[in-house]
């Protein structure tokens, strides 16, 4: 007894041929061992040749017959948004561009996300790949959601987020836990359902519980408004694994590159702070010509060496002091997590201690930036020895008081203005639960500018006190902070308190950009990932 079987195959594009073969049913077992299965490897994308994107989407949607029309539309809309160049597939550029427009998923995860989405031997994501990723990732996220949802009521609230993070070794206070909930909550219910959780975490490539907690902690709580004011927090696990020193090294290298590249702006600023007056009308352009004529191109980097050298001791001391002060404050509170204001206070205190320790290097930086050609022939240590011999130990702490007083106003005003602008944005743009990246950058820029405007007069007085002994025209000026303020207001008016602020603002964008790019590169090379 035999039966005829038809096996379809595609040849030459659309030509369909039927191949007939006789199968002896007595030897069906032997035959089965020789038959090639229909699908022996991962599917190949159907978007090939002249097949349109719409036709490919329709074909792949038909393969997932269990999807509802609403779900299909949601996946299709998301795929279209990610496919920035509309070429029918998603590559690394599409993902990076899409994530850069998201307020909560960092663009740095784009390579890992692409790896999770694409087929094994491809560098692009087809609609079929994306659909498979969404279905599988949402299933894994549902499992994570069930673990967080302790009372199984279908909603995750602040207490459950707090408990979940504690289980992963991260203690959060109520304010921080609620911050995470608010970022995910789309309905304003102060809790998160499964759909909201899946939507929020869909483009974050990991469902590992530890990774997700790190992502929440470093991207949903601490944002750009606090950068530079409060040192980075590290969990006990990160301290033990060495993540902390990798981030400090990355920050040090980034700071060195940023300061070196923007050193000319810094030297112009210092020169204008000390030498610009109402009568000589010395400006940025005339200052550039003057400095170049005196010492050439290299003169614009005077004082940069010690400015770079002081990064390491200052960063290390600030980190250690911040960690110790935090522990004391937490012990005083009975182990509770610190609030934002308390962290700001701890960070400012750590900054004050580290500034006190390295302040002599700050004074030397100012004097080296103002030196003339030939005044450093015997090296930096000889330069410091000359200062000590001529003026005594006190010279290394000239301008210390205005420097110390400038720390808290800058940090406090920066953070206050930032939070106020964020609140105003969400109040007037109610359709957005959280500001986007551009809005956050605008808030951060405005708050930083306000902080600088408030603290700049103190910085100017500090610089003049540091340079008073080596500046003949300033040697008759008062040797105290209050005396300097009175002298400037009487002789130059209110605008005299802002001499040199133009190059200070000019260096902000290149300094931040260089620092961010270098930090990310070095951090990745060292394997210090916390998101």
Curated annotation (Swiss-Prot):
Residues bound to Ca(2+) 2: 149, 151, 153, 155, 160
Entry annotated with the keyword RNA-binding: no
Any Gene Ontology CC annotation: mitochondrial inner membrane
Sample GO molecular function, one term: calcium ion binding
SMART domains, per database record: EFh
A GO biological process held by the record: ADP transport
Residues the entry annotates as binding Ca(2+) 1: 83, 85, 87, 89, 94
Record key words, sorted: Calcium, Membrane, Metal-binding, Mitochondrion, Mitochondrion inner membrane, Repeat, Transmembrane, Transmembrane helix, Transport
Domain EF-hand: 70-105, 106-135, 136-171, 172-207
Localisation per UniProt entry: Mitochondrion inner membrane
InterPro entries: EF-hand-dom_pair, EF_Hand_1_Ca_BS, EF_hand_dom, Mit_carrier, Mitochondrial_sb/sol_carrier, Mt_carrier_dom_sf
Family label: Belongs to the mitochondrial carrier (TC 2.A.29) family.
Protein task: Calcium-dependent mitochondrial solute carrier.
Entry protein name: Probable calcium-binding mitochondrial carrier F17E5.2
UniProt organism field: Caenorhabditis elegans
